[in-house]
Amino acid sequence: MDGALINSVLYVSPRNGAHYFVELTEKHLLAFEMLNSMCLLENYDHVLLFLECQFGKSHNLAVIPFDIILVLFTLSTLSEYYKEPILRANDPYNTSRETLSRRALKLLQKYLAILKEFDSEQYNLYDLELLRCQFFLAIDTLTPKKQKWGFDRFRRTKSESGVTYRQNASVDPELDQAKTFKNPYRSYISCLEQRNTILGNRLLNLKLNEPGEFINMILWTLSNSLQESTPLFLSSHEIWMPLLEILIDLFSCRQDYFIQHEVAQNVSKSLFVQRLSESPLAVFFESLNTRNFANRFSEYVFLNCDYKLPSDNYATPVHPVYNGENTIVDTYIPTIKCSPLYKSQKSLALRRKLIGSCFKLLLRVPDGHRLITPRIVADDVIQGISRTLASFNDILQFKKFFMTENLSQESYFIPLLAEGTLSEILKDTQECVVILTLVENLSDGVSFCNEVIGLVKSKCFAFTEQCSQASYEEAVLNIEKCDVCLLVLLRYLLHLIGTEAILDAKEQLEMLHAIEKNDSGRRQWAKALNLGNDPPLLYPIVSQMFGVHDKSVIIE
């Protein structure tokens, strides 16, 4: 993320608690009025067409007003698989263009990319600050307010699957028009002052501010992201996964701006924690509304993943955000069938992003302090997530969670989870507790290699007598998960210090030696059991990571 997005405040004029607020020029006021007028007439195709035609023409950025951003968010929920008749009625002459929902989503993604790049050489600085203001106004409107009851209070029933599906969306409560919408710009009339729904769907900001609906949206998205049921998967894949990714990015941008400009500098640690507890990400995670945050967060973020549920597990109820999302209209014909590999990759990437946002919040908490709300402690979250990952039954899902390409962006939490997960697995498979300091040693290649050598020689990555007591499949699964954790940590080691720092060092060669010898032991174990298939091997991957090709590490 470009620092200019956070630091640029040349045109900012704080108002009503919104430090980021930017006043309108006459030119932008005319554009805002025109877009709102088209929305009042439900001429959504023209709204989208106007915005689409602005891209790539010049350096002038067509700034989208925050109320139209909320309209685009809601339009994005109108996927044709369950709304095709309504979409056709609104846009009857569309025989070649994409649907309104896909066009709205693409526009949101394009504008978000411009916002994150914040390139003042490409666009006028005033336009960029005004665009930031509009997105921040929208995300502050979407932020769930404190409620008298929440999702966590709903009745939970015993279940073996971890999730219970309810068929219908929640009933929309009556709206108090005075409390539904407040336009900070009194120079024009917003369409949202007169409209609460878009083609039958209540405005997304109003829907998500209903009690329990914000967390239900997240759970509905995560649970359906791995579904085999076509309408449920489409609901997640076409609507809520891309929308939730946008929301997480916006909350992250808003958080950075809040810390930079809305928290007084040089305040005491106690006062800083108090302000941090009021920050956008804190409010975001407070929507979980639970006292036992670490365990419940782990349960929620891995909802519907394949892992061993605790014996006292209770099902988490979820329901459609909008009515009809769990059905397919007769006129819609699915054209794409996604593989389990694709589903796992997309689903686990989103879950990882959600976890990363939680750790981004926790990184700001000073040592010796804890957030007031939500009551999160970093060590508890690491342990809860690591415990769940260690109990995964699906190695594909496990790999897709850890094998990320964004090493730099996720370096502040993925190594901790890899080490924590490895520790939890070893706790279950070894006769003694193994204390790991691999993350501490990531900046010291020699110490890291020495620790790995010790773990390998202690048979932490070998098939042991305890493995023989379990089934072959379970033993192999545990070994594969241990291998993945080690490979993740090795990737970060090489990312942080570079291959050259330890290339051909005595400790590196000894580590490769120990791993190759360990692989030999795995083969002997499989041969002794007459299994026929080769067990998972670690050395071929590690040697490739360290650039060992023609070299041979001789086993004594």
UniProtKB/Swiss-Prot annotation:
Principal localisation: nucleus
Gene Ontology CC: chromosome, telomeric region; nucleus; Smc5-Smc6 complex
Keywords: Chromosome, DNA damage, DNA recombination, DNA repair, Nucleus
Subcellular location(s) per record: Nucleus; Chromosome
One GO MF term: ATPase inhibitor activity
A GO BP annotation: chromatin looping
Name this polypeptide is given: Non-structural maintenance of chromosome element 5
Organism the protein comes from: Saccharomyces cerevisiae (strain ATCC 204508 / S288c)
